[in-house]
Amino acid sequence: MPWALPFLFLFGVLIVAGCQPDRDPLPEGFDIQGHRGAMGLKPENTLPGFFKAVDLGVTTIEFDLAVSKEHKMVISHEPWFRADICLQPDGSPIPRDLERSFRLYEMSFETIEQFDCGSLQHPSHPDQQTLFAIKPLMSEAIEMIDDYARSQGVPPIGYNIEIKSDPAWDGSLTPEPAVFARLLHEELLALEKRLETPLLDRITVQSFDPRPLHALRAIAPTIPIAILTYTEGTVDDHLRFFGLEPEIYSPNYGLVTAEQVQRAHELGMRVIPWTVNRKADMQRMVEYGVDGLITDYPDRFNELFPRP
């Protein structure tokens, strides 16, 4: 029956279309966080990376903090200059066996900003664009990101700030945790006053180390806290380890289960796993019901979940 072929074709198209998943299953308020900016595409924890993250529509920029000799907040994943991604002020390489002697806590920011941490190809991100870039001050970075977002007609960006802290670093690579938390809080307050715009309500502070989180909670109880975990265990196990009730539970994505997400939600926490870079894992996290995710590749997330 040749006359029936067009109807059969149309019926088949409708069936296939009806079986397609929703193109945007994301719940309202889903938080796309650019890990160290957009680390897969631009040098980590640098202004070019932060601007790229804004261009890609992240709702939050995640970055790490170290402290300079004069107690300024410097954006850096390590409290030293890594030999594989940074060059000395004269352009010479940093000896790998001596990299931990290049301590930010023993340098003024005037010295820190002379190091190039963007021109070397990142060993784990071969597609990352290389360009001259420095470790910026937190205050200057937030102000410039806010200005850039405003110029692009983008809603105010959130900031997820990781305090890099370890008992072995206390007093040598970083300040004592209570001092670190106080310095961060004071700088955020001063920055909010200078910008004359709400800032603290866009801040989250996270750490793998419970100590600075406890110190911050004591002096700034309204700032949301995220606990970072990379070990196996239940949500309750991790809460016992940290000894506080955070607003956000942030485990390594490889350890996340639907049951964990459900339990965290029962306890009133949002779940934002790290660092989710493969599309299949992004899809799985969304299916588990997470409230956001941290990724080096916001562009991949956009391809998977197109947004207006």
Predicted regions and their residues:
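Bacterial N-terminal signal peptides
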Residues: 6-15
